[in-house]
Amino acid sequence: MSRSIKKPPFCAPHVLRLANRAIASNRNAIINIHSRSSVILHKFIGLTFGVHNGRTYVPVKVTDNIVGRKFGEFSPTRRFLGHAGDKKVSRKG
């Protein structure tokens, strides 16, 4: 089910507070956050967030294309190493 239209988009209060401070100070520093479930709001355009993936902070530059999506979508938590191939045994003559 999708979120009710009556409710506003979820954004953690500390993420809003950090973003408001960055907007007020006009700094281009990376804002490190752990809240992967927060929705990217229109006021975040131009800011860079470091989204935690469990090990490191992945930088996410907010543009108008990604407004309305969640921060966690841009910070993968698992590394894809490729599909397992056939392990063919080589025979010597």
Curated annotation (Swiss-Prot):
One matching Pfam family: Ribosomal_S19
Alphabetic keyword roster: Ribonucleoprotein, Ribosomal protein, RNA-binding, rRNA-binding
GO biological process: ribosomal small subunit assembly; translation
Alphabetized InterPro entries for the sequence: Ribosomal_uS19, Ribosomal_uS19_bac-type, Ribosomal_uS19_CS, Ribosomal_uS19_SF
Domain of life the protein comes from: Bacteria
Gene3D superfamilies registered for this protein in UniProt: 30s Ribosomal Protein S19, Chain A
Family that this chain belongs to: Belongs to the universal ribosomal protein uS19 family.
Record HAMAP family: Ribosomal_uS19 (MF_00531)
PANTHER family reported in the protein's UniProt record: RIBOSOMAL PROTEIN S19P FAMILY MEMBER, SMALL RIBOSOMAL SUBUNIT PROTEIN US19M
The protein's name: Small ribosomal subunit protein uS19
Organism per entry: Anaplasma marginale (strain Florida)
Lineage, uppermost ranks: Bacteria, Pseudomonadati, Pseudomonadota, Alphaproteobacteria, Rickettsiales
Gene: rpsS
